[in-house]
Swiss-Prot record:
It comes from Homo sapiens. This is Envoplakin. Residues 842-1673 are annotated as: Central fibrous rod domain. The modification Phosphoserine is found at S1575, S1799, S2025. Residues 1-841 are annotated as: Globular 1. Exclusively expressed in stratified squamous epithelia. Keywords: Cell junction, Coiled coil, Cytoplasm, Cytoskeleton, Keratinization, Phosphoprotein, Repeat, SH3 domain. Residues 12-28 are annotated as: 4 X 4 AA tandem repeats of K-G-S-P. Induction: During differentiation of epidermal keratinocytes. Residues 845-1135 form a coiled coil. Spectrin repeats lie at residues 229-330.
Length: 2033
């Protein structure tokens, strides 16, 4: 029907893009899908309704035509009822269409306006048909003096009341209904305007004013409804998203069995860093919108505040849950870390115990040295034991802080206390942070039952609680490990003593050694004792130093701890020095004693002890010195860290505490200057960061020395590295924040200046406008002049509207910029530490400057509007005055003419003239009478015509009343619901059929016309069609297989361990010694062991995954073969027909309809049950009300929060709860009291009162005849009332028309008077507006006073309640006792728990399926990293073919003969585990339904009891009144028994029917689930394909547009370059002429400088001679040394190694090794002080060479700036020594100062941060610098290219080319620092001009690469040329420069790449490679500055000279005026090496 729907595919509401699946929060994509489905159903329903309206219109036209013919032929009208019914149906459908089109506009349908136009056309046609209907069937003969009349005042008043009485909300459904009704009402009001424009009469002005008020009120209500709908929709979406996030946190398992804590932590950190701030901003935006709407007095304040409160509470609960999640994650991580470390300690203790049992039992016949060696090994074991002891002590300390997580899942055996982590308020349950509760029940893992301090029990989320530490199991395990450690220490001591004893026994001589030999050698014994003592003291020192080295520093006070250690270390060093002296003395004594060759056991042990002491002393000495260096470096580093942190924290605090921009004139400029000052201060503090990095390097070197020599890892180094990185990041973040804020404020200042200028101009113009007023003395000429001037002024005011709009636009832009500034400040503040963020002052929501600008904008708009209105009003006054003056002049002319005629005529003529005038007067009277008669005839004819035409709006009024009829409203809603339901079903079925048909046709056509491989991508997307259950089953089988393999591997590992233990228990031999040492050395590094185990496990897992993938391929092959054999005999055409038959199986449709009917019956039964239950509740309440209410004197008021409103609400709820509990207890007590009375009454014989019987029977008896008569009379009364109302309305209408007609006939000539009466006196609209504002002010004052009174009352109530607190607690306990029935509570908790368990199981299954699917995808992704890539590709290709074949076979439906599709589906769904879980779920569901049935049965029992009570009571009455019949007849008792039996039978049958309905419902659910799954997957696939097609088309269009733009820009750039070259050439020629004279002057100056230089050099030589002579007299020497040692990180382990070890292992090649050996040096600065001053010399102690610094300064190898940099410490001595020596290395990339890779840093691909990576030697070449600057041959100096161009030494084009070459090879070169900078950095440092930035940026892309717009990957320029993203002509010069300077550059790799390797890797094409290799064909685009000939870049490099200091290439150039002078100069210029 709609014309809009035929213009595109969007007609059915298909969206232009499909949201991505699996969004992080999930809500936006679901909303989008829901909106899309709703839009599709809406459009289909509208289509159906519009078609029906069209049919009704056509049928009505036919029937009206027939009845019109019958009326003309005077026959009876036949189709009046059918026509009226059709028109009513069309009106109902039109109402629905208006509602639907408004909803479609809100859902942003692209063709909503066209649909609305179509609906309006239908409405006009229906209106026209209604008019024809009334004209034909409702003809009315009116009297001739009565015409049609509409009482507009009453109609408009009714509409005004209807608009004012309109409600808002409170929900979205009601709001949508209200919007639709208002749209209909708005259309009616707009239609009234057309009638009122032509209204004429005395009340026309009043009615129009009333209509304007109505129109304003209607438009205001429409705007209010729209804004309310937008706000409520945003709140609803945000609430749903918050609820989903809360559900995820609450449903998480926080016990020790948590599935993936690391994944949850990553997800939480990602959400906290990237999503939390945006979500908070959206919530704050919604709150701000709500507050703004409330402040603006929005009529829907109630719904807005309700949603605001709900959103605020949900957001607070969500933040509290985030706190809970953080705490629970910390508990889980601490628990797991403790368990892992405990396992490690346990394994270490077991290993040590086994070693003690196996290794340290010496053989009886072993050699004598074996015990000594075992003692040495035992010392190593003792060190390991000491480490384990420290770890055990740490575990014991930490065990007291570990939370008992297993108790969260175990039921408490005894009362257990839990703490609340956060505040929680769910309405029913409130928790406070830090409160302690008692855990009652934790069977539900997600909701615990806890008991509060007051004894009340509540069910709260388990995530909000934590069980306080300690964990008994953790404490017990730590104690157990400590006991095991003590036992092991005792065992170690026993073994050590045994070994010492055996060593002493083995050293005794076996010959005739007398037993008293020891006594014969007392000196030997004394020396041995002294050596033992020295050995013990050295061991103690070693242990002390190792303890210092191993123990980490104190986290709170690292500096104090480190200073204390250094102080202790100094004492230890002094003690070690004294021990060394003592050792030397003892050594001399021992050597002297041993020279005498003594005998005896002590003498034999003495050499061994002496060697041991010497070795240990040397080791301890080295260890002590290394630790001292490490401690000093760490101390320096810690101080630097604190200094840097203090500096950076100061800047951060300044930024955080920055005040908002004030509303002052120069505030923006002041803020810019302040930011610039802070930026300068930050740059000044850069040295602090540099010192920090140098201190870190020194600390790393010291730690590396300690680790290489003693294998002692520094525990504090990783922490210090992290702190340094964090400080560096914070420093850069501060700089970025300052730059960003400065840029924003500068832009805002510029915009503010523009706004200020525009505002000032407009304000000045408005103030100086001419003020012309109308004066009574003004004549016609003055009035005309003023009128013309006023018209010009009005036109000028209208033309100034553009300036006002510009000012408004600038104001909005400026406010947005300031808002952005504040947002950036808030974002940065949130990213800092909480301490800084908390200390920051509270910033206002709107900046003062922003408020000032907003106020200025409002004042300007107000002033402009007032001036425009005043001038327009003055213009109207002038026009009115002009008209009045014209009339006055005309009347005066007539009067003067008449007076002149009368004075000139005679009396006779006056008499004749009077007769003639009388005759003429009579004739005029006759003519007037005739004209009046004709006028009356025409009026009568007009009246007749008016009576024939119906008034359309009158019928519209009736339609509105028809809509408001309550009975018709109810029937209309029911019919509407039925129509909507049927429309939805029809639309869904139609959409499914269309989608299925289209899909079948498309697949058939594609299968016939396309090749199979073209369907690969689509098949891959359809691959997800198999059921999740089958995938889960397969994955579970694979997991079981993996677990089995793990068990086999673990068993094998245990066997290997046993074999290893058996081998270790064997006798110790010589070979075993090496093995033991090796083992001890490896065992020290536990991280390496864990990494090796992880690598082995990963390799085994990879092998298992690959094997599983191959097995999966084999299974798929077997499955394909089976399917092919099964479907080999199937014909495709028959299958296609069978598909259609299966799709439209009538049996299934009948079954579906039958099931739907059964479902409807069950729903009706459920509704009946609900009604019965509600009736029971109502009756129960009636029974309760029969007792007097129990009013307690003390009410419970539990105050949980300080907020008075919350406190009042809680008090009300608790009072209500107490009241209900009291009522229940009272009712129960009353029932117990009444039961014996009831028995007594039943046993008694009632008395008889016949009088009351008669009265009651007559009063309560209702005869059916009487009821029918009453109903008939009521209907008749309603008809009479309706007819009277219609007659009354008709009477009022006719009277109004009569009065109007009389007034029209009574008017003679009052038009002029009525027009002149309308004057601009007081605007009634403004008066009403002022009155309304006054009323609002009064109401606001009343509300404020009421609020103050309410606050005062609440405060008084709060004080009263606080005084009554002690009494409330007692009452609370009593209330708790009288709560609900325990059995019912237990039954309810059990039911809710089982339901939650089932939901949790289902979610757990879904989570497992997702995890397994992710594991499968991860396994498939890991296959790509295997070495055999070709085999993998073949397997994937085969897998795609197999899956394609499977998909085709599965899509091919079976034949008629083979209906096995359902059987196959059943086979696929059958899985043992799944069936078991399904059966368990079904059993649980049956149990729950049984329990529900029991509850229903109990409800029925209660109903029966209540009925018995009521019957008993009623029987008391009845028996009391009719005792004779009831007491004597026993038939009633028999009837009652029979009814009870029937009731039991019906109950049993009903339960059976409910069971059958349950089974049918399950079958229906399964069928509907299956159908929904199929339809959803099909729609998703269709949407995905449509989206892909649209995306492809969009990208193609963008590509074509970009290509066109690129071509246009290329042409523009070429034209600009031509113009620029011409301009620069002309300027260069002019500058050359001007520079000739300047060059001559400079030559003279240079000659004078040369002479001065020669004299200064002569003076320096003389001073040197004098100083050398004086050196012999007095000389002092000061030495400063620095040794440079190069270490290389091993790529796998990260250990340091020397270059020689790296060369031996093959990590670097020989050339690199030689270069690194050359770089190693040991520089020493020797400063000699004499009478002539100081002289410094650099000495290389490695080679013995000396270099003088003064000589280097004289020879200009170094500059004074470099020497000062070295003295200040900014230049390392290694680099300074190279400069002084004048040595240039062939590669700058291997220098000590630049071990940083020169590869581009903008590449998104991952790069290795290690310089010496294994890929370094794969053909990558070194890069050399391009032409870096200009060598001035006239002054013998170097200068930059910018300076050379400025001096006209170099033409601009050549300078531009040289700069582009630098940018293309790594950056612009700074000649002073030899550093390279990017284009932007170079522009900031002044190395280049701003005019050439764009070309340099284009050249820089050759180094950094470009981003592929499609794949978002980083491409080199060669790849970009191949893909067509860049033209080859613009790229070729940059590639040529890269090739000439060392090789091409790939932004994804390090170093330079030769052309051949680049060609092999696909970086460049063959054609481009040939162009690059042909160097002779390079374009000569450079100009030689000296010879002015054209050069290529290669030739220019050949003519360059090398700077001796930096090795940079400098192009020779000279000023033209100096070439002759330099050639004739006798001084030979210094050559450049």
């Amino acid at each position: 029907m709609f014309k809009g729907l035929s213009k595109g595919s969007q007609g059915k509401g298909s969206p232009k893009g499909s949201p991505a699946k699996g969004s992080p929060k999930g809500s936006p994509s679901r909303h989008s899908r829901a909106a899309t489905q709703e839009l599709a159903l809406l459009i289909s329903r509208m289509q159906a309704n519009a078609d029906q309206v069209e049919r009704d219109i056509l049928e009505t036209q036919k029937r009206l035509q027939q009845d019109r013919l019958n009326s003309e032929q005077s026959q009876a009208l036949q189709h009046q009822q059918e026509t009226g019914r059709s028109l009513k149906e069309a009106e109902v459908l039109l109402k629905d269409l208006f509602l639907d089109v408004d909803k479609a506009r809100r859902l942003k349908h692209p063709q909503a306006e066209e649909i609305e136009k179509d609906i309006k056309q239908l409405h006009e046609r229906v209106t026209q048909e209604c008019a024809e209907y009334r004209a034909l069937y409702e003809k009315m003969v009116l009297p001739p003096d009565v015409g049609p009349r509409v009482d507009w005042a009453r109609v408009l008043e009714q509409k005004q009341k209807q608009v004012c009485a309109g409600q808002y909300g409170p929900g979205m459904a009601e709001l949508e209904q209200q919007i639709a009704e208002h749209n209909i009402l708005q259309k009616e009001i707009d239609a009234y305007g057309q009638q009122l424009r032509s209204l004429v009469g005395p009340d026309a002005a009043t009615i129009r004013s009333q209509y304007r008020d109505l129109l304003k009120a209607a438009s205001w209500r429409g705007q209010s409804l729209g804004s309310l709908y937008t706000h409520l929709q945003g709140c609803t979406r945000q609430l749903s998203a918050l609820a989903e996030q809360q559900r995820r946190i609450l449903q998480q398992d926080w016990s020790d069995l948590m599935a993936d804590p690391a994944g949850v932590r990553r997800e939480y950190e990602h959400f906290k860093q990237h999503e939390l701030l945006s979500q908070e901003q959206s919530v704050n935006q919604l709150e701000d919108d709500g507050e703004r709407m409330v402040e603006l007095r929005h009529p829907a304040v109630g719904p807005i505040q309700a949603h605001q409160e709900a959103l605020k509470m949900e957001w607070q609960n969500f933040l509290n849950l985030c706190i809970c999640q953080e705490t629970q994650l910390q508990h889980v991580e601490d628990y797991r870390r403790f368990q892992e470390e405990a396992d490690s300690v346990s394994q270490t203790l077991a290993k040590l115990n086994s070693n003690l049992d196996a290794k340290y039992s010496p053989a009886p016949g072993g050699p004598p040295g074996a015990p000594t060696e075992l003692l040495q090994q035992l010392e190593a074991e003792e060190k390991r034991l000491a480490v384990t002891e420290r770890a055990t002590g740490d575990l014991q300390r930490r065990s007291r802080d570990v939370a008992p997580l297993p108790q969260r899942r175990n039921p408490p055996q005894q009362p257990l206390h839990v703490d609340s982590i956060c505040d929680w308020d769910s309405g029913e349950v409130q928790l406070l942070q830090g409160e302690r509760y008692k855990l009652v029940d934790n069977t539900d893992p997600h909701a615990w039952v806890v008991q509060g301090p007051g004894g009340e029990t509540k069910r709260a989320p388990a995530a909000c609680f934590c069980i306080p530490a300690p964990d008994p199991d953790a404490v017990a395990r730590a104690s157990r490990l400590a006991s095991e450690l003590q036992a092991l220490k005792q065992k170690l001591a026993t073994v050590q003593s045994r070994l010492k004893a055996s060593a002493v026994e083995s050293l005794r001589p076996s010959q005739q050694a007398p037993s008293g030999s020891d006594l014969a050698n007392p000196q030997a014994q004394k020396l041995l004792t002294q050596m033992t003592r020295l050995d013990g003291d050295l061991g103690q020192i070693e242990r002390q130093v190792l303890a210092w080295a191993r123990a980490p520093l104190s986290r709170p006070t690292p500096l104090e701890d480190l200073e204390g250690r250094i102080h202790s270390h100094e004492g230890t060093a002094q003690r070690l020095q004294s021990l060394g002296t003592e050792k030397e003395t003892a050594q001399k004594e021992c050597e002297a004693f041993l020279s005498t060759r003594p005998v005896g056991p002590a003498a034999l042990q003495l050499p061994v002890a002496l060697n041991s002491v010497k070795n240990k002393f040397s080791d301890v000495q080295v260890l002590c010195s290394l630790y001292g260096e490490k401690a000093k470096a760490a101390l320096d580093l810690e101080r630097q860290i604190q200094d840097a942190d203090r500096v950076i924290r100061g800047f951060e605090a300044t930024l955080v505490q920055e005040a908002p921009i004030p509303a002052e004139p120069g505030a923006l400029q002041e803020r810019v200057s302040e930011l610039q000052r802070q930026r300068r201060e930050l740059l000044e503090q850069q040295t602090c960061v540099l010192r920090l990095h140098r201190a870190l390097k020194a600390s790393e070197h010291a730690c590396a020395a300690l680790q290489n020599n003693f294998q002692e890892f520094c525990q504090d180094l990783p922490r210090q590295q992290r702190q340094v990185r964090a400080l560096t990041d914070r420093y850069h973040a501060v700089g970025d924040q300052l730059d960003l804020r400065e840029k924003v404020v500068q832009d805002a200042a510029l915009t503010y200046q523009q706004f200020k200028n525009c505002k000032d101009n407009l304000s000045s113009w408005l103030e100086h406008l001419p003020r012309s007023q109308v004066r009574p003395s003004d004549g016609p000429s003055q009035i005309a002049y003023k009128l013309q001037a006023q018209k010009r002024l009005t036109q000028e005011i209208q033309s100034r509207e553009r300036d006002r709009a510009t000012a408004s636009h600038l104001s909005q832009a400026l406010q947005a910029a300031l808002q952005d500034y504040e947002l950036q400040a808030d974002t940065y503040r949130c990213s800092l530490e909480p301490t800084l963020a908390v200390s920051a002052p509270k910033r206002p929501r709107v900046a003062p400057l922003q408020e000032s600008i907003q106020a200025q904008e409002k004042n300007l708009a107000k002033a402009y509007t007032e001036v425009a209105a005043a001038q327009q009003q003055l213009l109207q006054q002038l026009e009115f005055a002009r008209k009045m003056l014209e009339k006055k002049e005309l009347s005066e002319d007539i009067r003067r003419t008449h007076d002149a005629k009368q004075g000139s005529e005679s009396p006779a003529q006056a008499g004749r003239e009077s007769e003639a005038l009388k005759a003429q007067l009579e004739e005029e009277r006759k003519r007037v009478a005739r004209v009046q008669h004709e006028l009356e005839a025409q009026r009568s004819q007009l009246l007749q015509l008016r009576t024939q035409r119906p008034l359309e709006r009158l019928e519209e009024k009736e339609v509105v009343e028809f809509y408001r009829d309550p009975q018709l409203e109810g029937s209309l809603s029911r019919v509407k619901a039925q129509v909507e339901e049927e429309g939805k079903r029809r639309a869904g079925l139609q959409a499914d059929l269309e989608v299925a048909a289209q899909k079948v046709v498309q697949l058939e056509s594609k299968r016939k016309t396309m090749q199979p491989h073209l369907l690969t991508k689509e098949v891959t997307q359809v691959e997800r069609d198999p059921g999740l259950d089958s995938q889960a089953a397969q994955l579970r089988i694979q997991i079981q297989q993996l677990r089995g393999e793990d068990a086999v591997i673990s068993a094998r590992l245990e066997g290997l361990k046993k074999e290893l233990l058996a081998l270790e228990k064997r006798e110790v031999d010589v070979k075993e010694k090496v093995v033991v040492k090796e083992v001890v050395k490896v065992e020290k590094n536990l991280e390496m062991v864990k990494a090796a185990q992880a690598l082995r496990l990963q390799m085994e897992e990879d092998a298992a995954r690959r094997k599983q993938a191959e097995e999966a391929v084999a299974k798929l092959q077997a499955r394909i073969e089976d399917l092919e054999r099964a479907i080999s005999s199937v014909e495709p055409k028959v299958i296609v027909k069978e598909v259609k038959k299966v799709e439209q199986d009538p049996g299934l449709l009948q079954e579906s309809s039958r099931l739907r009917s059964l479902l409807e019956e069950e729903r009706t039964k459920n509704a009946t049950l609900a009604r019965e239950l509600s009736d029971l509740h109502s009756k129960y309440s009636v029974v309760e009300k029969q007792r007097p209410k129990v009013q307690l004197q003390e009410r419970v008021h539990e105050i949980f929060q300080v907020d008075p409103e919350t406190e009042q609400e809680i008090t009300r709820l608790k009072a209500k709860l107490q009241e209900m509990a009291g009522k229940r207890s009272g009712v129960e007590k009353e029932v117990e009291k009444l039961l014996p009375d009831l028995e007594v009454l039943r046993a008694q014989k009632p008395t008889v009162e016949y009088k009351e019987v008669t009265q009651e029977v007559v009063r309560h008896e209702r005869s059916p005849e009487v009821l029918r008569e009453i109903d008939r009379l009521k209907a008749q009364l309603n008809e009479l009332v309706n007819s009277h109302g219609r007659s009354q309305e008709q009477l009022i209408r006719l009277q109004g028309e009569r009065d109007e007609w009389r007034r029209e006939r009574a008017k003679v000539e009052t038009k002029t008077v009525s027009k002149e009466v309308v004057r601009h006196e007081k605007d009634p609209v403004l008066e009403k507006e002022a009155e309304r504002l006054r009323q609002e002010v009064r109401e606001a004052a009343q509300k404020r006073r009421a609020a103050e009174d309410a606050v005062y009352e609440l405060q008084s109530k709060r004080l009263l309640l606080e005084r009554r607190k002690p009494e409330e607690k007692v009452v609370v306990q009593e209330v708790v006792v009288t709560q609900k029935d325990p059995k019912l509570r237990e039954e309810h908790s059990r039911l809710s728990g089982s339901l939650d368990e089932e939901v949790g199981r289902r979610r757990q299954l879904e989570l497992e399926v997702q995890q397994l699917r992710a594991g499968v995808e991860e396994q498939e992704g890991l296959l790509s990293f295997q070495e055999d890539r070709s085999k993998k590709l073949a397997v994937e290709r085969e897998l795609r073919q197999l899956t394609l074949r499977i998909q085709e076979l599965e899509k091919r439906p079976p034949t008629v003969q083979e209906k096995i599709i359902m059987e196959e589906v059943v086979k696929l769904e059958k899985d043992p585990d799944l069936e078991k879980s399904t059966e368990a779920l079904r059993w649980d569901l049956d149990q729950e339904k049984t329990q529900v049935t029991e509850l229903n049965r109990e409800c029925k029992n209660l109903q029966v009891q209540i009925d018995v009570l009521q019957k008993a009571k009623s029987q008391e009455k009845t028996i009391y009144k009719e005792v004779i019949r009831v007491q004597k007849d026993r038939v009633l008792e028999d009837e009652r028994a029979r009814v009870w039996e029937m009731l039991n039978r019906e109950r049993t049958a009903r339960q059976a029917r409910e069971e059958e309905a349950r089974r049918l419902r399950e079958r229906i659910d399964r069928a509907e689930t299956l159908g929904r799954t199929w339809s959803r997957e099909e729609s998703e696939l269709q949407r995905a394909r449509d989206q892909a097609d649209q995306e492809c088309g969009r990208l193609q269009q963008e590509l074509r547009a970009l290509e066109r733009q690129k071509q246009q820009q290329t042409l523009q750039l070429q034209e600009e370059s031509k113009l620029l070259s011409q301009k620069t050439e002309s300027e260069r020629q002019k500058a050359a002429q001007r520079g000739q004279e300047l060059s001559r002057l400079e030559a003279a100056i240079l000659r004078e400088k040369d002479q001065i230089y020669e004299k200064e050099r002569t003076l320096r030589d003389l001073h040197a001679k004098v100083s050398r002579e004086e050196l012999s007299q007095e000389t002092q020497t000061r030495e400063t040394n620095l040794s440079t040692k190069i270490s290389i990180l091993e790529p796998e382990t990260g250990k340091d190694m020397s270059p020689y070890e790296a060369y031996k292992r093959g990590i670097i090649d020989r050339g690199q090794y030689l270069q690194l050996q050359e770089l190693e040096c040991d520089w020493e600065e020797v400063t000699t002080s004499g009478p002539c001053g100081e002289e410094s010399v650099l000495l290389d102690r490695k080679s013995g060479k000396q270099y003088s610094i003064e000589a280097a300064l004289r020879c200009r190898r170094i500059s004074k700036e470099e020497y000062h940099l070295y003295k200040d410490g900014h230049l390392p001595i290694s680099e300074f020594a190279l400069l002084v020596a004048g040595e240039t290395k062939p590669s700058s990339s291997l220098s000590i100062g630049s071990i940083i890779s020169k590869s581009p840093l903008a590449s998104p691909a991952p790069q290795s941060t290690s310089f010496f990576s294994p890929s370094f030697s794969l053909g990558l070449g070194d890069d050399s610098f391009p032409i870096a600057g200009i060598y001035d041959t006239t002054t013998d100096n170097k200068c930059s290219i910018k300076t050379a161009v400025a001096k006209n030494m170099l033409d601009p084009i050549t300078g531009q080319k040289l700069l582009e070459a630098q940018a293309a090879t790594g950056g612009i070169v700074d000649l002073l620092s030899r550093e390279r900078y990017s284009v932007h950095k170079a522009m900031e440092r002044g190395l280049i001009e701003n005019t050439s930035t764009q070309r340099l940026l284009n050249a820089q892309k050759a180094f950094t690469g470009i981003e592929d717009p499609v794949t978002k990957k980083r491409l080199s320029v060669g790849e970009a040329v191949q893909k067509g993203w860049m033209p080859r002509e613009s790229v070729l010069p940059h590639l040529q420069v890269q090739h000439l300077t060392g090789g091409l550059i790939d932004p994804k790799r390090t170093g330079r790449i030769p052309i051949q390797q680049a060609l092999l890797s696909g970086m460049i094409s063959e054609e481009l490679a040939q162009l690059l290799q042909d160097e002779s064909s390079y374009e000569k685009d450079l100009t030689d500055p000296i010879s002015k000939e054209r050069l290529s870049y290669k030739e220019a490099m050949g003519r360059c000279r090398k700077d001796p200091l930096s090795g940079l290439l400098l192009l020779p150039a000279a000023l033209e005026g100096y070439r002759c002078y330099r050639s004739a100069s006798p001084t030979v210029p210094r050559s450049l090496r």
